[in-house]
Amino acid sequence: MKVRASVKKMCEKCRVIRRHGRVMVICSNPKHKQRQG
């Protein structure tokens, strides 16, 4: 899980979603998981 100021899709499988007011990226590749914070 990477915590970043700006979250971006790193591949075509990445999905940008909102959970509990946070912007997150979920992906089949665990290295691409990101959270805004």
UniProtKB/Swiss-Prot annotation:
Keywords: Ribonucleoprotein, Ribosomal protein
Superkingdom of origin: Bacteria
Name of the featured protein: Large ribosomal subunit protein bL36
Name of the gene encoding the protein in the UniProt record: rpmJ
A GO MF term: structural constituent of ribosome
Native source species: Prochlorococcus marinus (strain MIT 9303)
A Gene Ontology BP annotation from the UniProt entry: translation
PROSITE patterns: RIBOSOMAL_L36 (PS00828)
Record has Ribosomal protein as a keyword: yes
Any single Gene Ontology cellular-component annotation: ribosome
